[in-house]
Amino acid sequence: MAILKWKLSRWHTSDQISTTETADPKTTEATNNESTQGTKRRRLDLPDSRDNTQYSTKYTDCAVDSRPRGGGLHSTTNCTYKGRNVCSSKVSPIVHLKGDPNSLKCLRYRLKPFKDLYCNMSSTWHWTSDDKGDKVGIVTVTYTTETQRQLFLNTVKIPPTVQISTGVMSL
């Protein structure tokens, strides 16, 4: 305490230093408007990071994300996918590649030169409710057409340790 008094006395006179009283917290306009307990203060000079309306998605040309929101699945008479009775107007053919997660990661990097043969490729993921205990990784690949999917499967060499499942996805 004596060192603090000595340091402060070098810049201030002794009547400005109070050793027995505590200082009142100073408030600013920003702290008066918002509760500071448990919340972050918003920076006014930056745009709101939660507002995604200014960014356009790069997936607009893909069949998976081009379906308008709010509509449910409906039956169509000209549905090309015979595996289901109910088809959406916008479905995307997919392939699930299943196997060891590290092998799938390496396969994803090996498939980058073939990106014109697919629309989107997911990161390696797995089902969390799997009771078996083995962590089989899954990579989902989407296509714009079934022809593109077939061309991908005919062109790309998939390792024999990776299981291939085909299907469709609608959002």
Curated annotation (Swiss-Prot):
One Gene Ontology term from the biological process aspect of the record: regulation of DNA replication
Keyword NAD: no
Pfam families reported in the protein's UniProt record: PPV_E2_C
Xref: InterPro entries: E2/EBNA1_C_sf, Nucleotide-bd_a/b_plait_sf, Papillomavirus_E2_C
Cellular compartment(s): Host nucleus
Electron transport as UniProt keyword: no
GO cellular component: host cell nucleus
Stretches for region Disordered: 15-54
Molecular function in Gene Ontology: DNA binding; DNA-binding transcription factor activity
Function of the molecule: Plays a role in limiting the replication of viral DNA in keratinocytes. Recruits the host NCoR/SMRT complex to viral replication foci to mediate repression of both viral replication and transcription.
Protein name per its UniProtKB record: Protein E8^E2C
Protein species of origin: Human papillomavirus 58
